[in-house]
Amino acid sequence: MKRLIVVFGAVGCAIALACFSERGSGPVAGPAECRVPVSVIDSLHFIVAIRNFAFHPDSIAVPAGATVTWVNCEDVGQEPHTTTSDSAGVWGSADLTSGDRFSHTFATPGKFPYHCIPHQTFMRAKLVVQ
């Protein structure tokens, strides 16, 4: 009887640990942009990775006519992010979940600070179109 109680107790503890432990899903396996630290595809296509609640790189200069693509490289299940110009109407993405991407082509030179709406107090970056 004692042995049976010990076995059931051990099984119960194992089940409880499995149910309540926090397990990450690991890195995003999908987009190649998340696996390789690439920010320039060619002279008119640039990648900004969203990882660890930050934009990488956090400052980028591109020529007029370039397309910038933001890719959410956070683990599956993390909070969504946006990429939104500080100046209203320049650009703004919908919520980007893990693996999602948003692209915008910049025709006009200028300085464009931007942020993530849900995390705008700390998740900020700058884009310069030359």
Residue spans for each PLM region:
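Extracytoplasmic copper-binding redox domains, predominantly the cupredoxin/blue-copper superfamily
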Residues: 19-130
